[in-house]
Amino acid sequence: MALNIENIIAEIKEASILELNDLVKAIEEEFGVTAAAPVAAAADGAADAGAAKDSFDVELTSAGDKKVGVIKVVREITGEGLKEAKAIVDGAPSVIKEGVSAAEAEEIKAKLEEAGASVTLK
């Protein structure tokens, strides 16, 4: 079977975000790799250690007992539809928002925890 790169790219273009997320996870597991971007080493580690983190990823670690409420909050935060929000909650642990400010991350965390979810900021 010949590998047709153009067909693969066309399929990827038509896939939803959730399908692409599942694809990335499957590739990571199959080949033992990660999709994380490499971290550049700082020239001066001491100067970097003192700098405050300015962007955070909000990760849903568990939906808890009130799954329906958590799905509603995830829909509100992400702007996704019901099906997509449910898939995000069912797929926990999963990142809800990436690269948000500390204030926004804390606000999202508070909303999710109020709905009954467990959340971590990375």
UniProtKB/Swiss-Prot annotation:
Gene3D superfamilies: 3.30.1390.10, Single helix bin. One of its GO terms (cellular component) is cytosolic large ribosomal subunit. The keyword Phosphoprotein does not apply. The keyword Ribosomal protein applies. One of its GO terms (molecular function) is mRNA binding. Keywords: Ribonucleoprotein, Ribosomal protein. InterPro entries: Ribosomal_bL12, Ribosomal_bL12_C, Ribosomal_bL12_C/ClpS-like, Ribosomal_bL12_oligo, Ribosomal_bL12_oligo_N_sf. GO terms for biological process: translation. Belongs to the bacterial ribosomal protein bL12 family. Forms part of the ribosomal stalk which helps the ribosome interact with GTP-bound translation factors. Is thus essential for accurate translation. This is Large ribosomal subunit protein bL12. The lineage of its organism: Bacteria, Bacillati, Bacillota, Bacilli, Lactobacillales. The gene is rplL.
